[in-house]
């Protein structure tokens, strides 16, 4: 069709068909089974000759059919079975199969039923066997191997016609064994079974193709095992691995002679072979005892190896090493037992489970948990010293472990903090051992630990409820009665675990509460002075301790009002303050601007009035009301100034104003008590107090600037308009963020006056750190334009003047109050405009001011 001539192909040389096919890669079988099994040794294979004849076209010469192979002797079959059970890759390098624990456990499943029958028969039947003298020389594992070989021989007798069925059953057997071995984490056994499974699959494929499969090459059946390690097996000796030496009588040899010989091992001389029956029986019993001991040792060694493997898989390397060391000791004992030396099993280690329980119990005994504190622990000084050292040691270890955990998690700050606390505990332990006095109150207690011996009263601070109950007891004893003996109350020891007063309360319970509350504040100051803290650290410690006590008192008041949620909230804040106190003690200062502010006082509902407007009343009731209002006003000022200095981080001024606020509150309580009793008002007077305050407009944010147009003064009127007919309004323009996009607005129109009162506020958006804003503040300002409002379409709005305000003072002040001149072009008009500009705080520094105020003080006027 394409121009080719149909010609006769060149004839191929005769007899070259098979060679050409092989050159082209045809009829070449690279199957893995042939590579693994090899070519059969029989050169006269009829199937191969028939196939060759079909390929070459030559008639096959008929040859006499070879005779079948003679069956192999039992000794060779037994040897082949043992070779099949051996790992061909050399992974399990065991020279002696009799000591392989894994193979013993595997064979144990195969011959389990026979062993049960043997255990039910008395041991004397074994002695009556004609081969008793031979079995005496073998151990029980050898008998198990022989019985398994017998079963394997039985399984090897496969009918000729059921080869495919046998291979399929054998493959199913191996697959089940592989799955069970993988579930039991026996990787070596699983790999060995997988190699046998590959061989079986190759044989099955060869059998399906019609090729001959040699029965002797079929891998023997294996024990499927069990999918999980059961607590007890059919072999009774496994029970002995879970018992002590006293349970060794439960070994399968249950005869009295075996027990006697186990307790008293026979002398090696008595094991000499003799011809009389008594000597044979004695040697047999001794051999059985050795077999039992060896079985127990092998099983116990296997248990420890399995326990080491499980510990390694769970990541407990130390426990795995310990179990492996114990299992190696069993090898030494087994060698001694095989050499004929007597072995005492009384010191044999217990099972891994019992060993773990014993180790745990020994740890509990070595490190007992501290007993709960008792009421008379301070009286037993001899026992308290030891328990105190133990408690300190436990807490030091706890902080060391916490530091290690923090390091491992990457939290270096927390790790350093825990290390400092651990060092503090270490110094305390050294001082305690040296007999020096130590202050246990400054040691932080780790969470979950009981209080140190001798410090039981701090247990009440462990939880919110206990702290509130203790504080409530203090409050109840303070308000029961008015008449009291003050000296008797002062005689109470301050270090009582539960400071309850059995005497009547003072006349002024508020003062006693305050004194009770201020006592713990002085203790940390004393400790700080003993440890020579720097002045800044000591100042912050006093401030934080005082703030903590205030929150605890607020929690007490909330508890008395049955407001448990508020009380718990205050106690949580007190605990966070304790963390800050520990941080300051460790040498790191805190930012007091982030310290929680003073707790809100719900009893401070009042209306602030100016005391200049109050006239001195004649009635005592009016005097009480006036004093209460003034004290509330002073208290509010102190709290406001304290918050301002807290934001600045000034500890000294913050503490000063907080103390002044406490004095005002105490005076209010005195007035309330006196008024309730119907007494005359206590003496009082006014003093001029100089206060250093910081001006902060807290209602503004850092991105806001407030512009207030207050009023206009004598604004000029346009021509033709009388001053009283001026309808003026003010426009302003603030050139930020840019001159092209300024912020601008205007006021309302105030009609018929040239001195309008506007009092209008405008919030402007700013960015304090922006260079453009700073340039506007320094060089420009805010421009104002005053307009006269026109009427309808007759007149338009007419400008009557302009003014501007410089803002450079905002760098050092938070408020500018200016009365600026109104100009008509460059000509002054005589009118003025009052303007206020406010920031939250100055751009640079703080707006500190010194003011003098009249301060109400309760008491007589001091004499000069």
UniProtKB/Swiss-Prot annotation:
Stretches with biased composition (Low complexity): 229-241
Region annotated Disordered, chain positions: 82-154, 218-249, 441-463, 478-502
Residue ranges with Polar residues bias: 142-154
Residue ranges of every copy of the C2 domain listed in the record: 685-820
GO CC aspect terms: nucleus
GO biological-process terms attached to the record: regulation of transcription by RNA polymerase II
Keywords, comma-separated and alphabetical: Coiled coil
GO molecular function: DNA-binding transcription factor activity, RNA polymerase II-specific; DNA-binding transcription repressor activity, RNA polymerase II-specific; RNA polymerase II cis-regulatory region sequence-specific DNA binding
Bias kind Pro residues: ranges: 444-453
Compositional bias (Acidic residues): 89-104, 111-129
InterPro entries listed in its UniProt record: C2_dom, C2_domain_sf, C2_Freud, CC2D1A/B, CC2D1A/B_DM14
Pfam families on file: C2, CC2D1A-B_DM14
Coiled-coil parts of chain: 91-118, 162-209, 385-412, 464-488, 535-564
Protein family per UniProt: Belongs to the CC2D1 family.
Entry protein name: Coiled-coil and C2 domain-containing protein 1B
Organism annotation: Xenopus laevis (African clawed frog)
Gene name of the record: cc2d1b
